[in-house]
């Protein structure tokens, strides 16, 4: 094989191996010299009969010996060719050959495919037959002793039927599933395998079956087997992109085709089978799990089913690529891989008759378990649905039905096969009745034999196990081999067409969802080196803006998907395409987006959730049909090789010993395909070398990319070949390092997103994390904690490893607590205020928090309880502390975990707890906001100012607590008590407290400093400042007040009634306006006109910003209206400016007094006699103003004058009437009597400016909290 750039070295294969269809041919089986070696790594069960045990297999031969850039991995190939080692059979057993494929993912992420045909050969070695006989004698002796060992035994399903005294039964037992060297013929498994660079599964399967047929056929093959193997290794090239290729097997030609550069990448695994095995509903659910990078475990007795589903799912991910551990067939010796605390997609072979419940998996909290054989899946909790899932499945169903495949799957079952046969026969009978089919059966066949219907029928019948003889068609049908061959080819064509059409539907969903993704890619780096260096610190995708641009139903899925590694890699590839050749998948995807824009013009911001079907199905199917109908390339025919005479002698049933010298290297003569491919290869090599000189060193690039991603590529794909303890230990150490790094990244992300620094630094202005994004990040943290607690677990006791650990800790602590009779609590016992009213300290207890969760009947699973406990601990800022306490019980940790487990690596564990501790810097409400229906106990304390007021009053006090989720209703406070506890449905974040009394008795005046309310589960304590009197004839005469809450810090040991470490977020209305208790507070400094105007502008601006945020980001509107710097307080400052002092009037005068005088003026003055120009403007607004003021005055509430003004402002804001009322009041004659001449309300320019500012909130729909306007009927 000339035309290569360098002469091939001995035993190395030829240079242009990258252009060859197949790289290696491999033979695996029993080594006669080694004899029978039990496969200990496969977890051998010696209770089984020897024929059911597995033994070590070996690679007997492989050709060529090695390829320089793709070294032969002997251990991995042997392990995957025979994942359970050698198996033995006798003449009585089924010995049908079995085909399966496998994949080897190298550390750099590149893949090699293997295609294996396993068949059985007669054992000719007497040594092995004797060894098997000996094993059976030993096994039968053990069985004999076990049968007679007990008088009341029922040993197992077989032995239980044996009569203890019946020797004949024992003989039957020994004969069942046994081996007798004199009576039985022993067979052993052997595998032939092709290793290829691309997954041409159908072509390799046909070639291997022809090779096997040549071995088992009575007639020897036309040429020695070496000719066919040499041909496929060295003389069959890879078809170029967009072309088809025909090469020759032993008996028939084999056809394959490769998609073009602008088509979806090659996928030869039939999605039809995946749909039949799982059903469309399950397939889409598993696909969603893989998209969200959940741990996914496939489970089946059949290796090829595992590969078909795994490859089918990963193929559908286009344009994204699976970035983590990918082992579709997990050999029995590698079951420890399931302990990996990283996302994975793995396949596990089930043993015959094994129940799912007996399968012990290290971690199931975030596992998607797919039982392929039983058509059953188990999904993780908190699982978001794929966008437009119902319409999506409907579109996929239509495609399947066009190909005669039921969307619900299970067509492989015998029952479905029978239904199919009956359905087809019924259709034929109906056609005959209708006169569409002649009576003559031969004519029926002649009519149908060339049709698509019969081709599909025969292809389906072949798959479902319905033989053609069972259908009453003429015998001549089975004799027409050419017709069957054509039908078989047509079935393959239809499989390929179905494949591409299903994939087009999936690809179309992503094209629609991410049609505008480029608009949100952040490209800040000037060159590749600086981008790679700072990759970890940079945000590459504007997630918040992207999500705000999406339809609401898409958000639960998209918010989680854009956090995955596969999406991050996709965006990385997009940014890298500035400096280097675009990733092939990205190139195809971008071209499709361009096509959408050409045919479907739309603005990037006009997102819609209307489902848009795929429009390119016919086009995609036609391109495949055109390639298969007309061959672009035909490979050289197999031919005689220069072999030694007498070797390679044919012996039926035995695969011959191949001549290695003729298979070690390629041919010396020129080959036009190889020459052409080699030239292209050399050109590609020159371009690669050139780009290396110009651009960044590739090693440096790979280093940075590995560092930038959450786990390195070597961690994402552990090696299958080296299973030494040192390598396993090193792999585990990498897992530990990876978990620690992931924890650091997640906590940092949570902090940055919560504080909003990231968005500000990127120039997006102020940005707070949305509830949806926060929920996504916290769910991701819960998943990480579950994976950490599952790593290195010794004994699994439930689906949640974390909750299991907590339960065992709780059990030990409660036993200890009973012994010592002391509660587990941390922190001081009590907190006292200066007034002597005590707010009892909430116990800081891990066990108590667990009990809260255990009392929540809404949560049904251990995984749900663990997540709720994490959320509660995070909200209480105790997550790190609780976990530290949990892990402080070292004997328990040692009992539960292996030495290599993350939780037993002390240094890493301490760093992990430190990273979690950093989350205490921000406030989370992730428990309160999620569990909205649970009953929560609250404790309230009223703190009076004793120096100036009675602590106890004779009247009947009451309280009403309101939050974002509801209110308690009016609750009577027991007399002479300032503290009370109550239980009600979760109120959410607390916003207001209404407090009052009925003014009865002699001591009915009450000066309240503040009210404290605490959530007894989360520990959140709210302070509601008051500082005002409640009573008639004092202050503004109010018997009830509305107080606005501020959240206190949980760590402060100061007086809760006086101090607050954090700046107050909210204050009760009017507390900063003016206080009549001058002896206590002194006279506050009055703001000047400029400060007042600035305050108005700020208050209105805050309301405008509130409504410009996404709905889930908005805070409390009550605070913006009635809080310390709210609109009410700002307008009070305006109305107080220049207000004539009480010294002149000899009594306290309030703004409401001025309002009432204005109303009296409007009601008594006959405005019709006034200037008619003013009447038109004033009359409607003045009537409305009077109506609102009178409604407030007549409301059945004992609200003071300041409280009434607050209600008036709130209603005027809600109904957009303030800009009309302000000029009315400014022009009212009473203003000259009650205001100084320099007052702001008497300055026309200031009033006009105020009106313009208030008009900016006219377009917003303002909804007031019920507690603010309760009882006012307008």
Curated annotation (Swiss-Prot):
PROSITE patterns: DENN, PLAT, RUN. The modification Phosphoserine is found at residues 49, 178, 822, 1068, 1076, 1079. Residues 39-244 form the uDENN domain. Residues 772-932, 1118-1267 form the RUN domain. Keywords: Acetylation, Guanine-nucleotide releasing factor, Membrane, Phosphoprotein, Repeat, Transmembrane, Transmembrane helix. Residues 401-581 form the dDENN domain. Residues 936-1044 form the PLAT domain. One of its GO terms (biological process) is positive regulation of triglyceride transport. The keyword Ligase does not apply. SUPFAM superfamilies: Lipase/lipooxygenase domain (PLAT/LH2 domain), RUN domain-like. It is a single-pass membrane protein. The chain crosses the membrane at residues 916-936. The modification Phosphothreonine is found at residue 1062. GO terms for molecular function: guanyl-nucleotide exchange factor activity; small GTPase binding. GO terms for cellular component: membrane. The keyword Lipid metabolism does not apply. InterPro entries: cDENN_dom, dDENN_dom, DEN5A/B, DENN_C, PLAT/LH2_dom, PLAT/LH2_dom_sf, PLAT_RAB6IP1, RUN1_DENND5B. Residues 263-399 form the cDENN domain. It is found in: Membrane. It holds the Pfam family DENN. The modification N-acetylserine is found at residue 2. Guanine nucleotide exchange factor (GEF) which may activate RAB39A and/or RAB39B. Promotes the exchange of GDP to GTP, converting inactive GDP-bound Rab proteins into their active GTP-bound form. Belongs to the RAB6IP1 family. This is DENN domain-containing protein 5B. The gene is Dennd5b.
């Amino acid at each position: 094989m000339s035309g290569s750039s360098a002469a091939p070295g001995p035993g190395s294969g030829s240079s242009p191996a990258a252009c060859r269809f197949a790289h290696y041919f491999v033979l695996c089986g029993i080594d006669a010299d080694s004899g029978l070696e039990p496969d200990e790594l496969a977890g051998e069960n010696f209770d089984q009969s020897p024929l059911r045990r597995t033994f070590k297999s070996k690679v007997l031969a492989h050709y060529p010996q090695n390829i320089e850039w793709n070294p032969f991995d002997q251990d991995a190939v042997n392990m995957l060719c025979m994942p359970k080692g050698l198996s033995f059979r006798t003449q009585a057993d089924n010995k049908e050959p079995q085909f399966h494929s496998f994949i080897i993912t190298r550390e750099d992420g590149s893949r090699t495919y293997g295609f294996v045909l396993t068949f059985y050969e007669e054992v000719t070695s007497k040594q092995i037959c004797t060894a098997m006989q000996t094993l059976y004698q030993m096994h039968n002796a053990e069985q004999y002793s076990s049968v007679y060992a007990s008088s009341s035994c029922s040993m197992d399903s077989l032995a239980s039927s044996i009569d203890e005294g019946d020797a004949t039964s024992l003989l039957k037992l020994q004969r069942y599933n046994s081996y007798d060297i004199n009576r039985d013929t022993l067979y052993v498994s052997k595998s032939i395998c092709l290793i290829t660079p691309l997954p041409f599964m159908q072509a390799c399967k046909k070639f291997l079956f022809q090779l096997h047929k040549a071995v088992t056929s009575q007639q020897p093959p036309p040429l020695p087997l070496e000719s066919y193997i040499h041909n496929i290794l060295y003389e069959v090239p890879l078809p170029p992109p967009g072309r088809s290729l025909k090469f020759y097997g032993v008996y028939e030609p084999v056809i394959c085709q490769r998609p073009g550069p602008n088509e979806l990448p090659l996928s030869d695994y039939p999605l039809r089978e995946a749909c039949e095995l799982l059903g469309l509903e399950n397939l889409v659910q598993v696909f969603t799990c893989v998209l969200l990078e959940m741990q996914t475990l496939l489970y089946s007795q059949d290796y090829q089913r595992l590969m078909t589903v795994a490859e089918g799912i990963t193929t559908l991910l286009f344009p994204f690529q699976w970035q983590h551990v990918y082992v579709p067939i997990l050999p029995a010796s590698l079951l420890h891989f399931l302990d990996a605390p990283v996302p994975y997609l793995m396949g596990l072979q089930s043993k015959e008759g094994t129940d799912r419940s007996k399968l012990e998996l290290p971690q199931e909290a975030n596992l998607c378990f797919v039982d392929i054989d039983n058509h059953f899946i188990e999904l993780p909790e908190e699982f978001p649905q794929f966008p437009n899932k119902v319409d999506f499945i409907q579109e996929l169903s239509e495609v399947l039905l066009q190909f005669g495949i039921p969307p619900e799957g299970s067509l492989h079952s015998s029952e479905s096969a029978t239904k199919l046969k009956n359905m087809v026969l019924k259709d034929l009978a109906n056609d005959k009745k209708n006169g569409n089919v002649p009576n003559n059966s031969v004519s029926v066949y002649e009519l149908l034999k060339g049709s698509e219907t019969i081709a599909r029928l025969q292809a389906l019948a072949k798959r479902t196990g319905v033989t053609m003889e069972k259908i009453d068609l003429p015998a001549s049908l089975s004799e027409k081999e050419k017709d069957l061959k054509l039908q078989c080819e047509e079935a393959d064509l239809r499989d390929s067409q179905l494949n591409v059409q299903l994939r087009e539907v999936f690809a179309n969903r992503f094209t629609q969802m991410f049609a505008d993704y480029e608009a949100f890619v952040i490209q800040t780096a000037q060159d590749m080196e600086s981008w790679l260096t700072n990759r970890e610190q940079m945000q590459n995708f504007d997630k918040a803006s992207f999500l705000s641009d999406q339809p609401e139903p898409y958000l639960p899925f998209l918010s989680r998907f854009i956090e995955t590694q596969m999406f991050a890699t996709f965006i990385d590839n997009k940014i890298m395409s500035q400096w280097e050749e675009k990733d092939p998948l990205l190139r195809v995807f971008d071209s499709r987006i361009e096509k959408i824009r050409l045919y479907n013009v739309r603005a990037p911001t006009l997102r819609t959730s209307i489902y848009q079907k795929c429009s390119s199905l016919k086009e995609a199917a036609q391109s495949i049909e055109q390639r298969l109908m007309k061959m672009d390339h035909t490979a050289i025919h197999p031919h005689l090789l220069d072999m030694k005479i007498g070797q390679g002698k044919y012996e039926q049933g035995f695969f011959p010993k191949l001549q290695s010298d003729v298979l070690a290297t390629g041919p010396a003569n020129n080959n036009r395909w190889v020459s052409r491919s080699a030239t292209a290869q050399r050109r590609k090599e020159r371009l690669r070398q050139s780009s290396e000189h110009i651009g960044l060193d590739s090693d440096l690039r790979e280093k940075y990319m590995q560092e930038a991603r959450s786990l390195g590529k070597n961690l994402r794909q552990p090696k299958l070949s080296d299973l030494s303890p040192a390598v396993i230990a090193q792999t585990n150490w990498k897992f530990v390092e990876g978990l620690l790094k992931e924890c650091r990244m997640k906590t940092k992300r949570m902090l940055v997103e919560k504080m909003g620094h990231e968005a500000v630094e990127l120039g997006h202005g102020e940005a707070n994390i949305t509830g949806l994004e926060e929920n996504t990040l916290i769910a991701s943290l819960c998943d990480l904690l579950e994976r950490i607690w599952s790593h290195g677990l010794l004994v699994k006791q439930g689906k949640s490893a974390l909750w299991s650990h907590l339960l065992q800790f709780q059990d030990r602590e409660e036993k200890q607590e009973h012994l010592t009779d002391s509660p587990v609590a941390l922190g001081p016992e009590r907190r006292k205020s200066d007034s002597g009213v005590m707010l009892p300290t909430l116990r800081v207890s891990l066990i108590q928090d667990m009990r809260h969760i255990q009392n929540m009947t809404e949560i049904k699973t251990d995984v749900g309880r663990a997540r709720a406990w994490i959320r509660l601990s995070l909200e209480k800022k105790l997550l790190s502390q609780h976990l530290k306490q949990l892990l402080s019980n070292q004997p328990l940790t040692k009992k539960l975990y292996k030495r290599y487990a993350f939780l037993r690596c002390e240094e890493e564990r301490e760093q992990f707890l430190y990273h979690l501790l950093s989350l205490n810097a921000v406030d989370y409400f992730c428990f309160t906001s999620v569990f909205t229906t649970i009953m929560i106990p609250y404790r309230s304390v009223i703190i009076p100012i004793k120096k100036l007021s009675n602590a106890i009053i004779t009247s009947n006090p009451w309280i009403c607590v309101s939050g974002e989720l509801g209110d308690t209703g009016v609750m009577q406070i027991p007399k002479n008590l300032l503290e009370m506890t109550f239980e009600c449905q979760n109120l959410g974040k607390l916003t207001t407290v209404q407090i009052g009394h009925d003014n009865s008795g002699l001591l009915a005046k009450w000066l309240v400093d503040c009210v404290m309310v605490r959530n007894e589960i989360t520990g959140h304590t709210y302070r509601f400042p008051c500082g005002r009197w409640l009573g008639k004839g004092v202050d503004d005469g109010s018997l009830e007040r509305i107080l606005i809450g501020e959240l206190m810090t949980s760590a402060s040991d100061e007086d809760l009634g006086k101090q607050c470490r954090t700046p107050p977020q909210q204050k009760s209305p009017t507390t900063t306006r003016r206080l009549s208790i001058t002896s206590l507070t002194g006279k506050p400094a009055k703001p000047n006109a400029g400060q007042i105007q600035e305050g108005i502008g700020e208050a209105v601006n805050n309301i405008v910003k509130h409504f410009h945020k996404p709905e889930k980001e908005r805070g409390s509107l009550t605070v913006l209206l009635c809080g310390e710097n709210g609109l009410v307080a700002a307008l009070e400052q305006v109305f107080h400016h220049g207000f004539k002092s009480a010294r002149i009037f000899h009594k306290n005068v309030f703004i409401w007094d001025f309002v009432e005088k204005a109303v009296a003026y409007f009601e008594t003055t006959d405005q019709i006699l006034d200037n008619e120009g003013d009447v038109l403007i004033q009359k409607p607004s003045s009537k409305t103003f009077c109506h609102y003021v009178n409604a407030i005055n007549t409301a059945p509430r004992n609200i003071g004058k300041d409280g009434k003004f607050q209600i008036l402002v709130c209603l005027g804001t809600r109904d957009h009437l303030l800009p009309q009322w302000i000029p009315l009041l400014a022009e009212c004659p009473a203003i000259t009597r009650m205001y100084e001449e320099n007052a702001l309300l008497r300055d026309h320019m200031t009033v006009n400016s105020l009106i313009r500012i208030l008009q900016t909130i006219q377009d917003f729909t303002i909804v007031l909290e019920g507690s603010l306007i309760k009882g006012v009927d307008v």
